[in-house]
Amino acid sequence: MRYNPLAYIRSEKDILKLVNALILNTKGEGEKSSEDFWVKAERLYYSALIGYIWYEAEPEERNFITLLDLINASEAREDDEEFQSPVDILFAKLEKEHPDHFAVKQYRKFKMAAGKTLKSILISCGARLSPFDIQELRD
């Protein structure tokens, strides 16, 4: 039997609760309990991605594996602010169709950071979720 936390989302408030639980329960030893810039930035990105998955993905793709795949497809380049990753392209398309979409609003806030900062945020997101990105969970 598998547990899919995204299956319990019914509202945007639930997305935020899930993101809070994810951050709280993956805090490393020695990590400060006060929330710094990096954690807040991660929170924005997770909210955007989970919002996208919940609203836009096919029912069978509304799961943690899709979240991991989106994070793995994310990229920022310090030397090229115009570069667009596959995830950037997904959100650009969604923004054209639905500029007030919950996920788009979260993503816009996340993308306010410069390339070097975005890269650091993405590394933090990848590091936080790396224990879940194993074949056993994908099967």
List where the protein language model places each region.
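P-loop NTPase motor domains
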Residues: 1-139
